[in-house]
């Protein structure tokens, strides 16, 4: 018989391996940039201008603001920086209350930083920075100085100082109050305008909230050097049970102490500037039941926000205290980062400014109410949302035993209204960002 042959063994083709390569993160793409002030192959440098010396409020402004900026830069640099460069503070200038313009002109003359951060009480240098095309990121408590200046980016957009708002009236309703007082300083035009705006807001929504204006005084002495006993007596006689002021936190303490002295400790106060945890803690139960509204998501919120977590964690890593001005600095630094990132790896001052001005819903990662920078440099007018926020929102917290807690659900800390109408309505609770 013929020999048989064995069929050759079959072999299995080797498995092919597919390797997926993630595209590089565009944030870290380095491209040469020449002729841009404050930018070299290693860093993007900024100046910080603010008030430290001669601060009449006695509060931490410049240094706390700087804490937030430096924390944000540390956070981003820890990720790898931006376009192959580290973000840095080149130098810090104390404007000593009256020298903001002098410091701005020094920065303009030196021409050695990319942009400027600004936290001051007298913003007379903002116009010079704007007119010289320098990206400026600011603690925007100055509606007039920020208006119509498209190179100035506040932690909030340009506001209408004289317009009515629903925040204080809604807080009056929450407090169950019926007789409202509005107080402000006579020496400060901003304070006087604020005081009138609050009164107008109560008048507008009086029938909706079941409360009315009972006392108005926009001529208080700055810092209440003579106390406030006569005014408190008048308010007591008028049955005032809710007081909104446009005064600083020290004056609020003086007011609260006098109310307690005259047996009016249960009167609810609406504070404009007392989102200051050490100050509130030191006051103990003096401010129990009072309200204050930060202009960003409160630290007390529990919304799972990535940027809020990054802020709190980075501040802790650096050994810095949480503060209102630190968060403002963080938000301003995020705007600067966003401007450059949006401009792309080959950038300059103008392209960064233009890129940020094209953002129609900038919210600093959900920390603030979304801003449309394509239109919100222009001062809004009453009843017209063309240049205003799409939503009117506030995120109040209430004081108790020296601590603070959100009024809304901590997961949705903002109360918001449709801003296309002035009609009264119950607000919706919401959260922004992620």
Residue ranges and their predicted role:
Residues 150-263, 301-302, 306:
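Extracellular/periplasmic Venus flytrap/periplasmic-binding protein
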Residues 51, 74, 334-342:
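Short glycine/serine- and small hydrophobic-enriched flexible loop segments
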Residues 32, 60-70, 78-149, 217-229, ...:
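Beta-alpha junction/loop-to-helix N-cap segments that form part of ligand/metal-binding clefts
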Residues 157-158, 258-330, 413, 417, ...:
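Extracellular/periplasmic periplasmic-binding protein-like sensory domains
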Residues 1-23:
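Extracellular mucin-like PTS domains
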Residues 108-120, 137-139, 179-184, 238-249, ...:
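Periplasmic-binding protein-like
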Residues 317-326, 338-407:
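Segments of small-molecule ligand-sensing domains
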Residues 28-70, 92-98, 185-194, 322-327:
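Extracytoplasmic "Venus flytrap"
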């Amino acid at each position: 018989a013929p020999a048989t042959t064995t069929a050759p063994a079959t072999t299995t083709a080797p498995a092919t391996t597919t390797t997926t390569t993630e595209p590089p993160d565009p944030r870290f793409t380095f491209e040469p940039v020449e002729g841009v002030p404050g930018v070299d192959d290693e860093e993007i440098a900024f100046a910080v201008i603010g008030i430290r010396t001669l601060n009449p409020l006695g509060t931490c402004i410049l240094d706390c603001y700087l804490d937030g900026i430096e924390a944000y830069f540390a956070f981003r640099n820890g990720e790898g920086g931006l376009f192959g460069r580290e973000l840095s503070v080149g130098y810090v200038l104390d404007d000593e209350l009256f020298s903001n313009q002098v410091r701005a002109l020094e920065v303009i003359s030196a021409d050695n930083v990319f942009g400027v951060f600004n936290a001051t009480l007298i913003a007379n240098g903002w116009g010079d920075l704007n007119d010289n095309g320098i990206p400026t990121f600011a603690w925007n408590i100055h509606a007039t100085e920020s208006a119509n200046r498209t190179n100035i980016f506040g932690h909030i957009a340009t506001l209408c100082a004289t317009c009515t708002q629903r925040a204080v009236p809604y807080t009056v309703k929450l407090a169950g109050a019926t007789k409202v007082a509005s107080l402000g300083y006579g020496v400060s035009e901003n304070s006087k305008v604020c005081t009138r705006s609050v009164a107008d807001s109560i008048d507008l929504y009086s029938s909706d909230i079941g409360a009315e204006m009972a006392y108005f005084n926009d001529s208080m002495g700055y810092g209440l050097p003579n106390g406030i006993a006569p005014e408190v007596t008048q308010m007591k006689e008028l049955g005032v049970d809710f007081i909104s002021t446009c005064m600083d936190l020290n004056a609020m303490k003086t007011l609260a102490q006098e109310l307690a002295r005259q047996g009016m400790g249960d009167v609810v106060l609406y504070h404009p500037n007392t989102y200051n945890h050490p100050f509130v803690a030191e006051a103990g139960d003096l401010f129990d039941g009072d309200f204050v509204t930060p202009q960003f998501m409160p630290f007390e919120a529990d919304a799972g926000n990535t940027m809020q977590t990054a802020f709190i964690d980075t501040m802790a890593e650096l050994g810095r205290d949480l503060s209102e001005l630190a968060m403002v600095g963080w938000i301003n630094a995020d705007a600067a980062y966003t401007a450059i990132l949006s401009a792309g790896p080959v950038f300059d001052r103008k392209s960064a400014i233009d890129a940020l001005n094209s953002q129609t819903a900038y919210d600093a990662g959900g920390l603030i109410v979304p801003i449309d920078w394509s239109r919100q440099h222009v001062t809004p007018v009453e009843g017209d949302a063309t240049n205003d926020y799409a939503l009117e929102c506030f995120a109040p917290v209430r004081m108790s035993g020296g601590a603070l807690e959100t009024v809304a659900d901590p997961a949705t800390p903002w109360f918001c209204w449709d801003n296309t109408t002035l009609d009264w309505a119950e607000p919706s609770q919401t959260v922004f960002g992620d």
